[in-house]
Amino acid sequence: MGTNDALTSTEDAVTAGANDAPLPAPPEPPRKARRATSRTSDFRVAEQPAFVLHSYPYRETSLIVDVLTRDHGRLALVAKGAKRPHSALRGVLQTFQPLLLSWSGKSEVRTLTGAEWVGGMLPLGGDGLLCGFYANELLVKFCAREDPQPPLFNHYVLTLTRLAHGEPAVQVLRSFERVLLRETGYAMALNRTVARRAVEPERRYVFDPERGVRNADDDVPSHWPVITGQTLLDMEQDDYHRAQTVAQSKTLMRFLLNTYLGGTPLATRQILIDLQNL
């Protein structure tokens, strides 16, 4: 995929040669100078693949930008002067577009020092745009700051690409939700029960948010949604061509997300429910 090529550029290789006659080793720099150099390199990051998740005003002319980066996880960056009319950052810090970001600092909010648009990704529109905002809100809610998750970053890129190409939103969102929960520490094995038995297509099950798949015949809370084994197996294979799987997977994921968020509502989820019942 062109986008992945742009977002996974490799580091330059550095080679060194040697003269026939050995040269004396250069003197070591003073201790103080070495420590200062280490601090500078540790607190600067250059051209990191990233996406803007959300931004909001900061003081009169700046923005706080919530970003998802490939190798550093989710970060907050202050974009100084980004609200000024002629700021070069105004047209670059857009959601759903691949960027290369540079920043410095070690505090909770770093300072953005550079932003470059990578390109190669179609813009989102219509339902795809709403789904993109929904994915962004989930990332903000579930991803702790400074917790690198390259597989989740890569699946986010895939999600945006699929939405931009008009793939069915239901399938794209369920796939993203599952990867998000898995990569943020919530077990999502759907083909085996907590008793280590294989899920059977014709049986009825529930998903215990703390443990996993259980038989629906067990003594379980009445508000847990009951789902068929076929739905669980379809979800495990990312297969949503059955109408029953579409309906039951939506109910299950809504239940799990609400549980893991402690009942905190998702603004974009309600919009999607109202408009498209996604």
Swiss-Prot record:
GO terms for biological process: DNA recombination; double-strand break repair. InterPro entries: ARFGAP/RecO, DNA_rep/recomb_RecO_N, NA-bd_OB-fold, RecO, RecO_C. Residues 1-12 have a biased composition (Polar residues). Disulfide bonds: none annotated. It holds the Pfam family RecO_N. Residues 1-41 are annotated as: Disordered. The keyword DNA repair applies. One of its GO terms (cellular component) is bacterial nucleoid. It comes from the Bacteria. Keywords: DNA damage, DNA recombination, DNA repair. Belongs to the RecO family. Involved in DNA repair and RecF pathway recombination. This is DNA repair protein RecO. The gene is recO.
